[in-house]
Amino acid sequence: MLYRRWGSDKDFVISYTSSNESDKEIVEEVKLTLKAHVIELYLSNYISKDTAKKIIRAINSFKDYPSSGYEDVHEALEDYIIKNIGEEGGWVGLGRSRNDHVATALRLRTREYIFDIMEELYLLRKSLIEQAKKNLNTIMPSYTHFQPAQPTTLAHYFMYLEEELNTPWEALFNSLKLINRSPLGSGAIVGSNVKIDRKREAELLGFDDVLYNTISSTSSRIDFINAISSLTLLMLVLSRFAEDMILLSSMFVNIIKLPDSHVSTSSLMPQKRNSVTMEILRTKVGECYGDLSSLMMIYKGLPSGYNLDLQEMNKHYWNCIKHVIPSIHITRDIIQNIQIKNFGEIQGLTATDLAEEMAISGIPYRKAYIDVANKIKAGTFVAGISYTKSIENKKVIGSPNPSLLTQEIEIKEKRLNNQHEKFKQYKESVIEKMGQLGVIEDGLLQQ
């Protein structure tokens, strides 16, 4: 044990407080963070070029993260460096704390995950728009209170989902910018006597800026909770979609046919088409909300400053995050392959059309409404309008009217393309800034 100079060195105590398992997620980010720190020590004239070179080479050669014997990856990495290059390796501890380094590594890893998720979310929204274009005239019933309401189209339903997913997109992009602030150089809580250029370190790691207050830098996890909250918004939309698919594909409703690849049969009952992927998706959403709840429950009672409780939050970040991309993939595949079945006359689906036509012709709407309701109750209602005509008559913005919906699709497609371009530019700026670290590292190692 490199750091444990007080307390027990018994294996069961060390393993109880160790973060080794969750640290496996951030090994590369911890190495990257330490390299930025070593480069900063060199650029600030605290260590020689030769020492910096030796340390960076040792960092790069750290491949096999031991599963035991250390409190965390930071201790394992520093011990590895010292064992490989001698006491000179101990310079990595100058102006550094695990508190600011783990916070930095967590932000780097989360940033990469958000990059990946937003790219997948873009593809999902793009698929919704593309499928909406193809299904402007694919008629289906809409539902309120899960009772048949009025005729609509599959395109209208797809554009509803696209609109719902716009909110998580905006929330995620905002979360990304909050995550992309650097804690590095904050020390344990109040900074360090070592005159580290925190802004230069931030630039090397692709951050937008530093997270200024050093108490916040080292002990705040509010930006991570915010990011997970944004992801649960996304998963919430997917969960409602999953519920729609389960209900609408059931034999009781039988409006939608799910792709064969997304259903399975029973081991006993050969007629079954169980919507298994949608059932699992609902479960993953529940797990994400459990993770968010755990994060808030851990965080709510902590005094300011770093507490080891914070390391127990890490596993909940990764658990939720790792459910998101597979859930998006499953959703996109269903959207691209869904089929609406032919369905017959649904009693009363155009009842509102008749009541509104009567009102437009001069009868007060409530009187027309009661008249139509009485006909439905007596079983004498006759639909005087086709589903297609009913949809065409809805000439209000946001309706399933094909002409208006085509205009909406064009507007939403332009919005999505603009959002994606803005996101790409942001991601490219991060990559470009991080290139400086590689240039400096290469320069050191080649000399």
Swiss-Prot record:
Spell out the subcellular localization from the entry.
Answer: Cytoplasm
SUPFAM superfamilies attached to this UniProt entry: L-aspartase-like
Q: What's one Pfam family here?
A: Lyase_1
Which is an annotated GO molecular function term of this record? argininosuccinate lyase activity
User: Where exactly are the transmembrane stretches of this chain?
Assistant: none
| Domain of life (superkingdom) | Archaea
Quickly give the catalysed reaction. Answer: 2-(N(omega)-L-arginino)succinate = fumarate + L-arginine
GO CC annotation: cytosol
Similarity comment: family membership: Belongs to the lyase 1 family. Argininosuccinate lyase subfamily.
Protein's UniProt name? Argininosuccinate lyase
